[in-house]
């Protein structure tokens, strides 16, 4: 990753006007994507994600604002200049859009027709199929491929013009979880091997968690939160972001299950049911042991989860802290000093 911006959207607005009403699909959005980013844009259906990213290559012209891509003011380009610039921006979709009557090699070669010699095209197609792991499928037809393999063909075709940016518009939405994971791993590999900047549109925070380094959350046409992946996951500011993250981490189900446990139903007057979120160095500390040895507070762990985000440990615990009221409060103060984020679950439930 670098600090060089390759996509800069400023105050981008998109409105659709019908006979009876208007729709504000994108509402004055600012977005900066740096070279080498895998930038996830997540939101529910209808949030405006796809409309927003289609302004990057002007498949959707904005009603207002500016679009700068790879140093070019996209809105100032002539049609011929725009066609040239679009070759620097690849795109893959949920639907594969393959030509069923043509072989896989011919599908990948299609964008190159008329631009290279036959021999050069064959060489390029072979390189692309090798890149996406489909060398042995060059002479197959789309009907003979699985959904994941078809998407790999789509990726190879999108890379035919050697783009610097790849837009993935819900490209894994129609795939099963295992295949989704393999496609995401391929995208991450392409990012690392080719220096490819990727903008990933999805309604699945799990996909963002797996490969993105930055994330923006969209709702009702606006970006309501954005930032470094670890920062957003560890300290979400908006309720929608929290909901996405908790669903991905399965914390909602965990809390529902915990609330039914006898330990929780029979809490003492000074007991506290808490969610502890910790990142990085905090994950390496013997926090539970320290609570008991220094504060005489017992921590009953009802749920625990730790994951690695951007090579950094990120964990959540649901615990009952038991002890004297003042000691429990002192223990909580100690946890906060260790940069542990604390959420009182019973207050949240209330």
Swiss-Prot record:
Keyword terms, alphabetized: Amino-acid transport, ATP-binding, Cell membrane, Membrane, Nucleotide-binding, Translocase, Transport
Membrane topology per record: Peripheral membrane protein
SMART domains noted in UniProt: AAA, NIL
EC number per UniProt: 7.4.2.11
Compartments, record wording: Cell membrane
UniProt keyword Transport, yes or no: yes
Name of the featured protein: Methionine import ATP-binding protein MetN
GO cellular component terms, semicolon-separated: plasma membrane
Family: Belongs to the ABC transporter superfamily. Methionine importer (TC 3.A.1.24) family.
Catalysed reactions, as listed in the record: L-methionine(out) + ATP + H2O = L-methionine(in) + ADP + phosphate + H(+); D-methionine(out) + ATP + H2O = D-methionine(in) + ADP + phosphate + H(+)
CDD domains on file: ABC_MetN_methionine_transporter
Domain ABC transporter stretches: 9-245
PANTHER family xrefs: AMINO ACID IMPORT ATP-BINDING PROTEIN, METHIONINE IMPORT ATP-BINDING PROTEIN METN
First-listed, main subcellular location of the protein, grouped into a coarse class: membrane
Organism from which the protein derives: Lacticaseibacillus paracasei (strain ATCC 334 / BCRC 17002 / CCUG 31169 / CIP 107868 / KCTC 3260 / NRRL B-441) (Lactobacillus paracasei)
Pfam family, one: ABC_tran
Keyword Cell membrane: yes
Protein purpose: Part of the ABC transporter complex MetNIQ involved in methionine import. Responsible for energy coupling to the transport system.
Transmembrane segments: none
């Amino acid at each position: 990753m670098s600090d060089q911006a390759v996509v800069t959207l400023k105050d981008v607005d998109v409105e659709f006007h019908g006979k009876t009403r208007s729709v504000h699909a994108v509402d004055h959005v600012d977005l900066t994507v740096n070279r080498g980013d895998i930038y996830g844009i997540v939101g529910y259906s209808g949030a405006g994600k796809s409309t927003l990213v289609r302004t990057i290559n002007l498949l959707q012209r904005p009603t207002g604002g500016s679009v700068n891509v790879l140093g070019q003011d996209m809105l100032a380009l002539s049609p011929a200049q725009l066609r040239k610039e679009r070759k620097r921006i690849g795109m893959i979709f949920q639907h594969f859009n393959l030509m069923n009557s043509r072989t896989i090699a011919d599908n990948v070669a299609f964008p190159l027709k008329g631009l290279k010699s036959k021999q050069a095209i064959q060489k390029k197609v072979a390189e692309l199929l090798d890149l996406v792991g489909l060398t042995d499928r060059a002479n197959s037809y789309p009907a003979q491929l699985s959904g994941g393999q078809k998407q790999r063909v789509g990726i190879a075709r999108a890379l035919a013009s050697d783009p610097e940016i790849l837009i993935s518009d819900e490209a894994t939405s129609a795939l099963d979880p295992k295949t989704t994971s393999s496609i995401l791993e391929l995208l991450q590999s392409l990012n690392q091997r080719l220096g490819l900047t990727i903008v990933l549109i999805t309604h699945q925070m799990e996909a963002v968690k797996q490969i993105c380094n930055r994330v923006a959350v969209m709702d009702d046409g606006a970006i309501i939160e954005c930032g470094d992946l670890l920062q957003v996951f560890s300290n979400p500011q908006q309720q929608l972001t929290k909901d996405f993250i908790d669903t991905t981490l399965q914390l909602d189900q965990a809390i529902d299950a915990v609330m039914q446990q006898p330990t929780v139903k029979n809490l003492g007057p000074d007991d506290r049911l808490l969610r502890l979120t910790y990142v990085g160095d905090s994950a390496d500390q013997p926090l539970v042991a320290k609570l008991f040895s220094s504060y005489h507070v017992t921590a009953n762990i009802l749920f625990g989860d730790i994951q690695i985000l951007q090579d950094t440990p990120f964990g959540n615990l649901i615990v009952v802290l038991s002890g004297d009221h003042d000691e429990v409060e002192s223990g909580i103060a100690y946890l906060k000093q260790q940069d542990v984020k604390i959420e009182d679950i019973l207050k949240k439930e209330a």
